[in-house]
C-alpha cells in the first residue's frame, strides 16, 4: 500500500515536470515553424523559462467573479486535473501495479466525464465568453466522442482485449488518420480549438481563471496532450518513445500550420463523414475477425 502511494505521488511529479519541458519544446517548435527563435533568455537556452512561468502564474491573485462561488471556482479546475491524472492509469505499459483488464472502458468514461469540467468551468465563471466556450466544447464533445468510441472499438475487436496492450499491425493504420483527427478534437487543439477561440472569445471557458485555478487547467490540458501522444503510440506502434515524441511534434506542427476551422464545417465533418466511416470500419473489423 505504501509502495503504491509512493508510486502515485512520483507519477504526479513526473507528469508535472514533463509538462514543464513539453511547453518549452512547443514554444521552440512554434518559433522554428515561423523562422524565429523560441524563448532563449532565461538561463541556458531558456531551460528555466517554463519553471519561472509557473512561479509567475502561482503568484497571481485569483479574483472570484461576482455572484460566483469561490469553492466551485477552485474545485472545477482541481477535478479537471484529477481526471487527466487518472487517464494515465489506463496505460499498462507503465503502471502494472494499478492497471486492470478493462482499462479501455474506464478510459472512455473519463473522456466522457472530462467535458463536464469544461462545461461547469464556463458556468461558474459567470462570463458570456466563458459560457459560449463551454457550450461549444460540450457540443463538440457530443459530436466527436461517438465516432471516437467506435474507432476504439475497432482496435478492441482487432486485438481482442479491453486494454491498451497492442502490437504493431499495418491493418490498423487505416484507423490512425481519423483517430488522430479525433484526438485533436478531444484536446481542443488547432484547428478545432473553438472553445478557446482567442479572436472571438478572448480565452474561452478559462477567461476568468488565474493563479492556481488556471495552473490546474493548464496542467490538465497539456497533461492530456502528452497522454494522447503516448496512447497513440501504444495503440498503433507497440509503444515507442520515438513514436510518442513524433506524434506530439505532429500535433504542434498542425497547430502552427493550419488556421482555425469553421464551426459548422467541423460539426458536419464529424457527423456526416467521420461517423459513417467509423461505422463502416467497425462492421468491417467485426466481420473479418469474428466471421
Curated annotation (Swiss-Prot):
Chief location: mitochondrion
Transmembrane in keyword set: yes
Transmembrane segments: 2-22, 71-91, 104-124, 142-162, 164-184, 211-231, 234-254, 269-289
EC number annotated for this UniProt entry: 7.1.1.2
Top-level division of the source organism's lineage: Eukaryota
Recorded catalytic activity of this chain's protein: a ubiquinone + NADH + 5 H(+)(in) = a ubiquinol + NAD(+) + 4 H(+)(out)
Keyword NAD listed: yes
Membrane topology according to the record: Multi-pass membrane protein
Protein function: Core subunit of the mitochondrial membrane respiratory chain NADH dehydrogenase (Complex I) that is believed to belong to the minimal assembly required for catalysis. Complex I functions in the transfer of electrons from NADH to the respiratory chain. The immediate electron acceptor for the enzyme is believed to be ubiquinone.
Family per similarity comment: Belongs to the complex I subunit 1 family.
The protein's name: NADH-ubiquinone oxidoreductase chain 1
Amino acid at each position: 500500500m505504501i509502495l503504491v502511494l509512493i508510486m502515485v505521488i512520483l507519477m504526479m511529479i513526473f507528469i508535472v515536470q514533463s509538462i514543464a519541458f513539453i511547453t518549452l519544446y512547443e514554444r521552440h517548435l512554434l518559433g522554428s515553424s515561423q523562422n524565429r527563435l523560441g524563448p532563449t533568455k532565461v538561463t541556458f537556452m531558456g531551460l528555466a523559462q517554463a519553471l519561472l512561468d509557473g512561479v509567475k502564474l502561482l503568484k497571481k491573485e485569483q479574483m472570484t467573479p461576482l455572484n460566483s462561488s469561490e469553492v466551485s471556482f477552485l474545485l472545477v479546475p482541481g477535478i479537471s486535473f484529477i481526471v487527466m491524472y487518472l487517464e494515465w492509469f489506463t496505460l499498462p505499459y507503465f503502471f502494472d501495479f494499478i492497471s486492470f483488464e478493462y482499462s479501455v472502458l474506464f478510459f472512455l468514461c473519463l473522456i466522457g466525464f472530462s467535458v463536464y469540467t469544461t462545461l461547469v468551468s464556463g458556468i461558474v465563471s459567470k462570463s458570456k465568453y466563458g459560457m459560449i466556450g463551454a457550450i461549444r466544447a460540450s457540443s463538440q464533445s457530443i459530436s466527436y466522442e461517438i465516432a471516437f468510441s467506435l474507432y476504439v472499438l475497432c482496435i478492441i475487436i482487432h486485438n481482442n482485449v479491453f486494454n491498451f496492450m497492442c502490437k504493431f499491425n499495418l491493418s490498423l493504420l487505416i484507423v490512425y488518420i481519423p483517430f488522430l483527427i479525433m484526438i485533436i478534437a478531444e484536446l481542443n487543439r488547432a484547428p478545432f480549438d473553438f472553445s478557446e477561440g482567442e479572436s472571438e472569445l478572448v480565452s474561452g471557458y478559462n477567461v476568468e481563471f488565474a493563479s492556481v485555478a488556471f495552473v490546474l487547467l493548464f496542467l490538465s490540458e497539456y497533461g492530456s496532450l502528452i497522454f494522447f501522444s503516448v496512447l497513440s503510440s501504444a495503440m498503433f506502434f507497440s509503444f515507442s518513445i520515438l513514436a510518442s515524441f513524433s506524434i506530439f511534434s505532429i500535433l504542434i506542427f498542425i497547430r502552427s500550420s493550419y488556421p482555425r476551422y469553421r464551426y459548422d464545417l467541423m460539426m458536419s465533418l464529424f457527423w456526416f463523414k467521420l461517423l459513417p466511416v467509423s461505422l463502416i470500419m467497425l462492421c468491417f473489423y467485426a466481420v473479418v475477425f469474428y466471421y
